Structures are given as C-alpha cells and as structure tokens.
Amino acid sequence: MAKIIGIDLGTTNSCVAVLEGDKVKVIENAEGARTTPSIIAYKDGEILVGQSAKRQAVTNPKNTLFAIKRLIGRRYEDQAVQKDIGLVPYKIIKADNGDAWVEVNDKKLAPQQISAEILKKMKKTAEDYLGETVTEAVITVPAYFNDAQRQATKDAGKIAGLDVKRIINEPTAAALAFGMDKKEGDRKVAVYDLGGGTFDVSIIEIADLDGDQQIEVLSTNGDTFLGGEDFDNALIEYLVEEFKKEQNVNLKNDPLALQRLKEAAEKAKIELSSSNATEINLPYITADATGPKHLVINVTRAKLEGLVADLVARTIEPCKIALKDAGLSTSDISDVILVGGQSRMPLVQQKVQEFFGREPRKDVNPDEAVAIGAAIQGAVLSGDKNDVLLLDVTPLTLGIETMGGVLTPIIEKNTTIPAKKSQVFSTAADNQPAVDISVYQGERKMAQQNKLLGNFQLGDIPPAPRGVPQIEVSFDINADGILKVSAKDKSTGKEQSIQIKANSGLSDAEIEAMIKDAEANAEEDRKFEELAKARNEADALISSSNKAVKDLGDKVTEDEKTAVNTAVSELEAATKENDVEVIKAKTEALQNILMPITQRAYEQAQQAGGAEGFDPNAFQGGDAGQQKADDGVVDAEFTEVKDDKK
C-alpha cells in the first residue's frame, strides 16, 4: 500500500515526514534542510518556494508571500487581517466572496492556492526520497482552527494533488510523536504550541492499554492569530517608530524597507534567545531629498521582552481555560511539551514554567514533532501501524441560532470526535411554513458574535400552532472536525441537510480551476527543467569540445577543427533559444563529430605507450564529467555557527 505522508503546514516553516518500519523519517528537502520556509515568490513567470523564495525576498517584496496561513479561511474584514495589512509588503485584498486574498502581478490569488504551492513542494520532497508517487497525506492545523479554516486547508491539499486523508490538530500530533518516543506509562501532558502564526494549548492523556497507546485529548484552547509573526511585528513597530523619531521618515510606506525590516527583526529575535543584545544595522534603508538614510539600532533582550510581554501573557489565559475544561490542576500535569519555533524564546519558557510549576521538556524537537505525529497518524490510517488509538476533540462549540438571537449549543467544545448529536426544536409562530437553520461556531452567547458557518431552510411544514411541529436538528462532525448538519420534520419525514461550506471559502468550480492551473504550472515547470538540463548538457559539451581540440593540437586536422567549431557555434546559438529538441539535435551532432576524433587520438596514444589518463568518454558531453543529481550533492548556503557551550 502507498505511504501516507505527514505534513506540518506551518506559518513560518513546513515539514514532511513518513513512517519507515517502526521509525519516523523527517525528510530533507532538495536543499538538504529538514524544514522548508513557508514562503512563495512569483518572479519572471516562475514560482519559487522555500529557501529560493526567501533569498530573493528583499529585491521582490511585493511578490514574495509569507505567513499566508494567517489568512486561510478568513474574511477580509476580520480585525486580525486588517491589522496585518499595514505590516506586510504584499497586497491583501477583498475577494468577491468577502475572503482575504492576495494580489500578485495584477492576479488575485486565494490563500488555499498559495498554500498548495508549499504542499506541492512537500509532496515532491517526499516523492524524491521514497522514489514513488505520493497521493495521500495527513495535514496538521492549529487545534483552534474553525470549520472554514479546516475546509480551506483540505482545499489547499486538493489543489496540490493530494487526497487529504485526515486533518489533525498540531498539539495532538506533537503528543503522538512524544508518546511514540517516550513510552513512560500513563500520564497527562500539556502541549504548549506557539508557532509562527498561531497558538494552541491541549491537555492530553496518554494511556497504555494492553501494550497499545491511547492518546486522548481532554481539552484544547488557543488563539489563531497569535504567534512568532506577532513577535516580529512588535519589534518591527518599535524599529519603525525609532527611525521615525530620528529621521522623520515612515518606513511603513516603503515595501522594500519593510521586507528588510522583517528579515532583520526575525534574525534579531532569534539572536536574542542566546545573547543579551544585538545590533540591527540596515544601511541605505531608504532615502529622501537630503540623501540616503541608514538604520542602526541596538536592541537588548530586556527591550524585546518588554515589547512582547503582553503577547506572552496572552498565551497563559488559554492554558488556564484548557486546564479548567479538562477538570485538572497544574499538579495533575506530568509533562509540559513545547512545540513551535517561538517557544524557544527564554521569556516564553520562563512564563510556561512559572504557570505549570515544572520545567518544560527539552527533548522534543519543536520544529519537527508535529510532522512526526502527522506521519504516525498517516501510518495508522494506512494500516502500517495499529498500536495507537487517537481520540481528538472539537475545539469550539457548534450550535444554531434560536429565538432572541441566542446560540443554542448542539455539540459542546472539547467533545470527542467523530460525534453525532441531535436536538428537537419547534416553530416560533402559528402556521409557520419553514424554518431557517443558521449554524454557528464559537463560545459567545449571542449567535451573531460567533463564526457563521452556513445556513439552510427546511420548508413545507404543515400548518400547526407554534410549538407543535417537531424539527429534529442533527450535527455530524467527522474526524477532520468538518461538519454536516441536517434538519428533519418528524411529522412528515421531510429532511434537508448541508455539508457545511462556510459562507466564504472556495466553490468546487474554483477549486477545479485552481487544480488545472496547478497542473498547467507543473507542466511548465517540467518543460523549464528539461530545457535547463538540455542547456547544461550543451554547455558541458561545448566546454569539453573546445578543450579537446586545444589539448589534441596537431592530432586534429584543419577540416575537423572547422567542423567542430561550426557545430559548437550552432549549438551555442541553439542554447539561446527555447527549443529543447533543437538543442538536443545540435548536441548530438557535435558529439558525432567529436567522438571519432577523440577515439582516434585515444588509440594513437595507446599505441605510443600509454594514454596518460586520457579518456574519450570525457568529451561526450551530456552528463559526462558532471556530478550526477543522485550523487546527493546539493548547493548549500553556509552559515558560521558559533559554539555557545563553554
């Protein structure tokens, strides 16, 4: 059976893993890294993903997209989206359906479409490692993602050519990874997941049942717009204000300056986790009538901690609620597991330790644990692993609007999923012919203060006094946390139902169009790679041909030199065009001219008493003399790593 891979689709970085035997393998990407920046760039008709996109961000700020996960499944008018608009160099726009989309090169793109590019990169990374096509995946989402955000994530997978077998909550995935690696008996753990864009906390019970492990989520809470990006933004805001005081220039109006600030803030934040101060030095950050301006600001760890103290404090309240919902106190928690890159910040670790009264565990990789857990769940679904039972919960209450605009819960938050629950309602007026069912998700008592997931109508209700008709409303939530709602008139048996597709989101037609667009891009990418390979082979052959003629000297006749030079010129001209077949034909023509010359020279050298290492195959072009792609050699960036262990 084909492997089901596990993908952590992160705000800042993404990661892919797969179970091999009884071990999970975190798969390195083409650059040799175990995580891939969740950054996509559109440049010269090409789509760049990951490190290549990150490298060119400063010179292409308006077309380089990051932290797109913060927009997925969200409305443009959301307060959190509006806050981000002024802090990112790219353009966030309002789609026709009211969702938050982005605009690149005058083209409107849905967050699902952009996220699909990251998922395609993860898919390709897994395929290159496994040597087989991958079509199925388990993808992680923040535990506090609502129905619209979960559906949007599934849509992104579909656009990327993946059958998403399960959507799994990130803290739950981390607990799966922890449970597999640390078999320490029954215990209750808190997973504190502070990632690039979202925060979750889950209280999870790990139990050993006759050799099998049961991972049961007792409660979950969080904030889907709180993460490392907000920590970066707090520092960016400070730098912008300081520069404004000094130079009277607002850098927020300059996309290029904003992108440079973004990179510098992220770098400084990371440095301040291991040092007490750092200098942010950005020469020529902008210019005005008086000339170029340089930004040089020293930032201490204490200053950064002051800027983000309220953000760290915001993570503690969900921890209190999660414990209360689970009916536990901090003394009941055996282990605290930190997940997400932002959890490396010393202030975060200090506050978590103060709240839970114990030091968080440092033996779980915060960048990889979620992908590892997703891979374990993938193996469970494929039948490769059968000693784990996962019981997850729905993070938010699901209900309908009833008289007076009240939210009447049908499925309470922290209910184990999958789940199905029903409740009987009636009409509010005499002879009412139809009822409108409006489905909401959230914890507010007033229905309209929650997230509207969808609505539908049950009609043809027979005339009757108010309160007499019996309307049974059923909620059915699957293991992905995605909801189906039905309403049935018990007297007539008439039923109406909907698979909740939020009043926003992508239509099936839009998803299909995006899949076709992705497939078209894949074909373009294939053609581009084929053209690049043909050009590389041609260049290698041209170089070796010129070297051969020079090295062989008078062993080559004038006619042969002329023939080689002519063929070289024709091949050089062909490489400047975009016709792969012409390049291949001219390459073969040059090989056919060169081969007899080098073969003859080789034989003459042999007869003369040794070829001195001369090999005619070295001049065949193509891959000859080149490092094979499967030799495992990659281009890499080198960074000096200073050893802090004294």
Curated annotation (Swiss-Prot):
Record PTM Phosphothreonine, positions in chain: T198
InterPro entries, alphabetized: ATPase_NBD, Chaperone_DnaK, Heat_shock_70_CS, HSP70_C_sf, HSP70_peptide-bd_sf, Hsp_70_fam
Chain segments annotated as coiled-coil in the UniProt record: none
Region (Disordered), start-end ranges: 603-646
Domain of life per record: Bacteria
Keyword vocabulary terms for this entry: ATP-binding, Chaperone, Nucleotide-binding, Phosphoprotein, Stress response
GO molecular function: ATP binding; ATP-dependent protein folding chaperone; unfolded protein binding
Matches recorded under PROSITE patterns: HSP70_1, HSP70_2, HSP70_3
Residue stretches of biased makeup (Low complexity): 618-627
Induction, per UniProt: By stress conditions e.g. heat shock.
Function statement: Acts as a chaperone.
Family note: Belongs to the heat shock protein 70 family.
Protein name per Swiss-Prot or TrEMBL: Chaperone protein DnaK
Species whose genome carries this gene: Acinetobacter baumannii (strain AYE)
